[in-house]
């Protein structure tokens, strides 16, 4: 209830202002009645209206529940009643102002009360004006009776507790406002004590009010501090002025401030209605406000990037009320605002303000989007709450990070474990493969063991160790993996010497070298202990051939992966005094023994471990593996794949010691005593040569080196190790040492070096076959062989007596040496050794030229003249091939005489089991060369191992054949040696193109390559291109006989001997081969085809065929090719039947010959003539059908079909669609000759079927009679039906109207005065009549780029006029249409028409003629108006005033229902009503008794483009670039009713009005989703088309054209049986579709 002020002079209260707010449902109040005030939510000071006074409102009851109900103001149901007006005391008391903090008002009834306290005293808010100072209108004032008074003068209010405090108040207008009473200040004490004292003083809370009717959500007190943009009030009222549902925060919020905006500025207070109580929260949230506000200041300071809020008035400091608890006795009050976090206990009583809102960034944190809790408990705040929260968050974040790190570590460990397992699996697989390969190796018989090696062997070959001392140890890690009990020999005891405790081990099998162990051995050697304080635990000998070769070459032998054996005891630590012997870095501390899990390491892992093991600056860790890999490639063994060293740590000292201990083989005999000396020697030498990056250069030592002399001074400061022998328990005690490790192969290599020093040749035989590689081979042959990484160190072999090999040893004898029984050797790689021996170094012609002393050796040698090893003298590098000049030597007679005078060279001594072949020296040189060429791929060398057996057999067969040829009569040899006319040599190795003959007395030397050199060619292939040995021998006999006969009679031909020649080109080649024509066609080494004819004539041949007649075969005839060239080329010519290919080859030969600069040779002339003849031959047979191959005929037919149907392959599509339709329906037959001209396709989007053909193709391939048959069969097929439904949506005959004259021009010339009706482009209702000539001239005048800007020509009848029709009877035009292709049978009176034979002038079905200008935009603003921008900076000009002319015909169907049952021929079509008496005779076919019988008509049209005959078109007219004049959309006849229903068509209407909707792509897509099939296509000028019945179609003219169209009622439309198509017995085809071969494709 609001307080009312009274005027002292009048005694009546001032009339308040007019109330505002919603009105009651009763209507607007008047001055005589009560004025309804606003709702409880409106708190304006003028909303109070006192109750009217008068007799009608007299108070008669003394009960406060009923007496004052009629005198209360019409405020609302919650307003308490007033005392009756007849009591002046109460009225006087009512006039006094109420200043009590709480007021309790009685209820309106006995049961319902309103015990809520209302705040009646509060301060005026800043910025809000006070109430009006003017008195209200008296008409709105009704005096209220004063309330009952009490003893102290205050009005009586029942249920009021405590008693209100009253203060006299002056008049509202005259009395100044009273000062504001400040709230009581609480004593200075702690927060808890102040709260307890304040709680004890407070009166008990009133009971909770009932739930109000109008519920208004009240914001919580926190909203005034959350940066919402509304500042808190300057001063808060004391707690005593608050109710149980209010708090200081509420008063600071905007809603409570509006609720109390009626406070007067003079300090007087008025009673306000209570605010609506918000509904209690269903689930109150226990939320500490202070905890939320603790970090508010920090949050706002950090949010510097956000926009600052609008400036607001800063709140005044207010006294902090004592805190209270939610569980206190005064439970009706909400807790006051909490103490700020920085407020100390001593300052609790000081005036404080809520936290300053510097930024609104934390409002989203403090004020969530969800509903705020109604009541917030306020437990005692702690100063450390914010710190605890931060620490908790930090601990949580740290724990989360630790968890993530643990997960990452677990994943990393898992991946590492998987990688290790994968490596182990791969290692096991490789080890298994090595074991399987080793199991295949067999050892030689035991009885073939070599004798014991004597000590003098080492001194016999002092120059062997010029490069580098042998490696003093051999890795024995692969002993366990390679041992085989069944082939293992008995071990022999080892003498105790050198201070080492040696444990006898099993001999190793010869395994392929691995890359990793050489480095591991080198590292183990670098960190080898210097003192023998502890004996070695496991030292195993290495008796295999690899181990022996390794010592000789000075490299560590590759070993197999170590098995999982317990690690040996660690060796003693190295002493610092021995570190000066090797420039390596010692480990700072000894490493731990290796774990058992690391024992089974793969070779790749070991190689990776040895990459960076504290190397010395002078030691290279990359060079030895590279050389070893090349050496392994030489041996045909692929190197192991490289392995990353990421998971393979560097081997520790114990591992290196283990390698050294397990790989130290005791030397046999007395050589074991010098083991330590050899080791020391190797260390010194290794330290000097370790820093080389490329291949190691030889370091020269004294000329004669004694092993003992080397050992003594080096090891004098090192104690001699004592080697004690320890045998395995299971092995028998050997009686005497057996030289198991001495192998014949090792002895061969040692003797090879002896041969190199001893053997001297008078003059080396230099074969001139190797052009590209021979120079480098000879240059490097002089250098001493470097150490080979693939051979283990062998023990000194026994002295073997061998004879020097002569320089002229025969090739066949070398074969015999190589094929000696191999029981004398225990090597497991004998095929490799044999293969490596076969290559002999040669020099080039350029080398001989540089020397200036050509070799005068006979061109043809015998066995005893060949086989000598080449001289070690170097050869100069060859100059470029393009600048080579011919090397001339004496005549053959001189060579023959010199050969006869030359004494036979000494033969080789008998080869014993220990005598190696002298050609082993070539193998060592090859290894040296291969080490130099790092670009060679090891895969190419594996071909040697694969093809070795087959090539050796071929070599033996070739040797036998050569021996058979040598046994021939001497007469044949004399004939061959006679003088022949000078001609170019045709050798395979030396091309005569580079060395043409310049003299008749001298000829180019030719040396045929040895057959033993072929297996060594790296880029060779296994393909055989020659005959067998027996066949070659027989063929050679024929060739010799032919040559002898040719020498006597030059005219004799040997074509009959060589076999029949099929072509002139082959005949020419054979003539060149036999010597009739000179041809300089020779090939160089196929290994280097650049710059030779090898890559031109025979590009596919990478390996040369073997020669069976040796060198003399190519020398017999100067102008003939070698026999092997002849045979290989003859086979190629037989296989290659293409003449064009041979011509291309010969053209390339001629081009190459001209580039070299010898265009006048016989070869060039003959090649040019041959090319010309081949071209003539090809031209002669080009059009000869008798020689046509079936494939050629088929390809020609396919090309013709492709020409008919373009590149899209429409013939295949037509066959597929036609085959599909034939299987489903009974189609009319069509001849197979005509099917290739028919195209049947389906629209890719609409799936409707279209049939079409091209008339231009038809008239090119068919005659007049055939064309007539095709036209009738095509029309029958196009109108085919199934149960009365057409199968095709449209039929198109392209270019069929070209034979017709321009009908528009013909009408303008022949009927110029014919009146025609012309429409308008801008007004469809406007129709103009003019002569035909005028219209034609107007159209031609405005015709431009395919359209003319003139009105369309309406339909013009060509068969006469009826009623208001325009046109006439144009007989000539009708005759032209009848004679046009395809149109005769389907004219309205044609053979296929139901009314066949009627007169043309009586036809109601047409034809009609009309002209359309095409769609365009027609401007209407004239030519004077410019559309250009008026201002130069304007962005656009004015829009043109133009209108669109849509030249369209909406969807329609050329059919109607029968109008009369008695006369079936009387039907209403889309254009005319047809009535014919001539069809009455055929009425028996019609369905008279069927009232629902539908008659329909097909439509036929002819399109012609509008062209100006007098104008010259800029674009040239092409047949395939015809203008598109119509855009057609046709719907499948099966969907007739669906289309009519979807488009709301009325088929009984004319075509123009059947459908009012234009069908575009959007509608088409929608209809397609409903299953309606359609086809959208373009019709071009000079096209003809026909539309079967029941086909709804839509036309749009895109270019100016003239059209002639008519309706035709086909016979089968009126047949009750509904045949599949028209019957045409005279032109029908009785064949089925299976006669076409392409139909089933």
UniProtKB/Swiss-Prot annotation:
Consequence when changing residue 1454 to A: In y618; sex-specific enrichment of H4K20me1 is abolished from X chromosomes in XX adults and embryos. Elevated X-linked gene transcription relative to autosomes. Leads to increased X chromosome volume
Biased composition (Low complexity): 38-47, 91-108, 605-622, 761-782, 1465-1481
Positions bound to 2-oxoglutarate: 1449, 1585
Cofactor binding note from Swiss-Prot or TrEMBL: Binds 1 Fe(2+) ion per subunit.
Compositionally skewed regions (Basic and acidic residues) per UniProt: 14-26, 62-73, 400-450, 483-495, 571-580, 829-838, 966-979, 1422-1459
JmjC domain residues: 1431-1625
Localization annotation: Nucleus; Chromosome
Effect of disrupting the coding gene: Mutant hermaphrodites exhibit low larval lethality, and survivors have a XX-specific shorter and stouter body morphology and are egg-laying defective. Leads to lethality in animals with three X chromosomes and to intersex development in males with a sex-chromosome to autosome (X:A) ratio higher than 0.65. Overexpression of X-linked gene transcripts. Increased binding of the RNA Pol II large subunit ama-1 to promoters on the X chromosome relative to autosomes.
One function term, GO molecular function aspect: histone H4K20 demethylase activity
Residues that coordinate or bind Fe cation: 1452, 1454, 1593
Cystine pairings recorded for this chain: none
Region annotation Disordered: where it falls in the sequence: 1-108, 199-233, 250-454, 479-678, 716-744, 759-808, 821-928, 956-1003, 1105-1125, 1397-1491
The protein's Enzyme Commission number: 1.14.11.-
Chief place where the protein resides: nucleus
Matches recorded under InterPro entries: RSBN1/Dpy-21
Biased composition (Polar residues): 534-551, 985-998
Record note on quaternary structure: Interacts with the dosage compensation proteins dpy-27, dpy-26 and sdc-3; the interaction is probably involved in dpy-21 recruitment to the X chromosomes in hermaphrodites. Interacts with the serine/threonine-protein kinase sgk-1.
Protein task: Histone demethylase that specifically demethylates dimethylated 'Lys-20' of histone H4 (H4K20me2), thereby modulating the chromosome architecture. Promotes chromatin compaction by converting H4k20me2 to H4K20me1 leading to transcriptional repression. Required for X chromosome dosage compensation by enriching H4K20me1 on X chromosomes and thereby reducing X-linked gene transcription in hermaphrodites throughout development. X chromosome specificity is mediated by the recruitment through proteins of the condensin-like dosage compensation complex (DCC).
Family stated for the protein in its record: Belongs to the round spermatid basic protein 1 family.
The protein, known as: Lysine-specific demethylase 9
Species of origin: Caenorhabditis elegans
